[in-house]
Amino acid sequence: MSEATQYDATHARWKRDPEAYWAEAARGIDWDRAPQRIFDAAMGVYGRWFPDAALNTCHNAVDRHVAAGRGQQDAIIYDSPMTGQVQRITYAELQHRVAKLAGALAARGITKGDRVVIYMPMVPEAAIAMLATARLGAVHSVVFGGFAAAELASRIADAKPKAIISASCGLEPGRVVHYKPLLDEAIALSPHKPSSVLILQRPQAPCELTPGRDEDLLVAEAAAAPHACVSVAATDPLYILYTSGTTGQPKGILRDNGGHAVALHHSMELVYGVKPGDVYWAASDVGWVVGHSYIVYAPLLGGCTTVLFEGKPVGTPDPGTFWRVCADHGVKILFTAPTAIRAIKKEDPEGVFLKKYDLSKLEALYLAGERCDPDTILWSERLLQKPVVDHWWQTETGWTITGNFRGLGLFPTRAGSGGKPAPGYDVVVLDE
């Protein structure tokens, strides 16, 4: 079977019997109650996936890997040029920390369905907070760290969180962004007030805590009893992610637990061709959909090691940073935005910095977030001598709409093309 035929046959198989296709994909997830029905077209506006099933997303992303004997594998590699720190967190360590933070949230009254706003920089505690919220069956809403107070206030007002998890500061090249004054102002502006605020005190700029409301995150986590995973319906919400709309009220994307877990787990092998134990790096931010899907959930659902990077493509300290991270940690797939590659290309057009590093373990570069100009793809292919895949999707979908699929064998494509539709999508051009 030729490589192109494997894509064609797989897409045709999905189109012929979508429910059978997704029933098979659903076998990659641990269910508390396995789905008997795959899709109910009559539920909701667009139909609902796995309407009779139950699971916990945190269990699937963390606990099951420990139970399967992968506890000593790295789950998260935190690499921060901003602090000069590299921290490796195994699946067993991640399970311990997530269970403890879930216990701290539960002790503060957070239960299934409650909302938790997370306003954090790119630190492991951001991912731990997301997973701890999911562990309780609660709903997280991550707001990009450093967003202005008015933007944060509108999201607090809309989501009505019982708790907020934040940090004292974020770090940008040449400056410290103090989060606490922004958070205090946002809470003052919002008609809804959280009952609990947990703050990660970063040594670069600790902040004063508001008595009676604020607590030290790490102190609260350390003092808590670990909490087990709470089973939720597949159709129950996992998170709200507000789109960066410029008009009117913020628009919240509400993601369910079941369909999300199945699609993201499936995408790791289908789209990116990675398997458990592989190192995967989405150079994005947890505040955006790429961060939700491909820094936190998909790599962990797939039993991979995910890189959580606090830095920039250039200036932290140089345009070789991305290649240094790939070499140091044995990254197999790098996923970033064309803007990042263009910034590197501008500062290092001949790849002088790139040539300093051993990129033998890197197998492909994936790009998304905006259309990629052909020059950037051709430049990347020439210097890396690896496949470069431009793929397209949206906050609303959470994973690939069109792309090229390493798990099926890459088909030939032209620079500037967004590829072909993923199984699950029937893409039609309606107008020239």
Spans of model-derived segments:
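AMP-binding/adenylate-forming
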Residues: A138-V142, A157-S168, L238-L241, G252-E347, ...
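Conserved coil-to-alpha-helix start sites within the AMP-binding
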Residues: M120-A134, G146-A150, S284-G302, T395, ...
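Conserved adenylate-forming
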Residues: A149, A153-G212, P276-G277, G311-E432
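Conserved pre-ATP/AMP-binding loop-to-beta segment of ANL
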Residues: Q72-D74, V197-L200, T210-Y242, Q249, ...
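N-lobe entry segment of adenylate-forming
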Residues: M1-I89, E93-H96, K100-G103, L182, ...
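Conserved S/T- and glycine-rich ATP-binding loop of Class I adenylate-forming
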Residues: V116, T133, P237, T243-T246, ...
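Conserved G/P- and acidic residue-centered "switch" motifs that form tight phosphate/ATP-binding loops
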Residues: V116, G137, T246, G303, ...
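Conserved AMP-binding/adenylate-forming core of the ANL superfamily
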Residues: C58-H59, I76-L131, A148-A153, D216-L218, ...
